[in-house]
């Protein structure tokens, strides 16, 4: 029951697995928590990119605060489709432009946890290839029993990403994994994510 804040669902389990990863790479422990595919209480409209806190501030201080915000907000949001990834990716690109003003280099890891199939696959391919020189890697974690066949088209591990115009990626910018493949050893999810962060 994903609406029960007392019960750990796969989303929360994935977030907890990411806690160690965040601690290893982000000395500020700053996490931007964004939701998508939900009816926002303040507007009554479906949004495909919004702060989980339901405020104007998407940032959390550490994984525990991120999970707390998620559990507090989940009962207030009516989940809605279809599943679009590009708005979340676009928002991360905006964050990259802002962080580019900082004196130290910052690398972004966008983790998208989803239980639905993607409806903007072609646009995501195009945008990932277009922005492959940006300091960002994307990992999509599929939870549940949905048919995730489209998601594997975004996975760059075995072949280069290619869009409708035959443009191809030059690096491994995006990977897809199924949560159930790590269900017996969820800590391996964080280890897997480390493999897509450039050294």
Q: Where in this protein do the model-derived segments appear?
A:
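Acidic, low-complexity intrinsically disordered regions
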Residues: 1-199
């Amino acid at each position: 029951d994903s609406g029960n804040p007392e019960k750990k669902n796969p989303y929360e389990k994935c977030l907890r697995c990411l806690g160690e990863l965040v601690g290893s790479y982000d000395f500020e422990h700053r996490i931007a928590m964004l939701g998508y595919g939900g009816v926002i209480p303040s507007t009554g409209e479906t949004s495909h990119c919004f702060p989980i806190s339901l405020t104007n501030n998407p940032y959390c201080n550490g994984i525990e605060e991120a999970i707390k915000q998620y559990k507090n907000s989940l009962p207030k949001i009516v989940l809605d489709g279809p599943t679009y990834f590009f708005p979340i990716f676009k928002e991360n690109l905006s964050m990259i432009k802002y962080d580019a003003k900082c004196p130290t280099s910052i690398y972004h890891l966008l983790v998208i946890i989803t239980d639905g199939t993607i409806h903007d696959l072609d646009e995501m391919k195009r945008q990932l290839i277009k922005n492959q020189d940006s300091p960002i890697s994307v990992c999509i974690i599929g939870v549940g029993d949905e048919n995730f066949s489209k998601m594997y088209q975004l996975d760059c591990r075995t072949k280069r990403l290619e869009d409708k115009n035959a443009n191809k990626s030059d690096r491994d910018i995006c990977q897809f994994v199924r949560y159930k493949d790590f269900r017996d050893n969820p800590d391996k999810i964080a280890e897997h994510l480390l493999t897509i962060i450039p050294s």
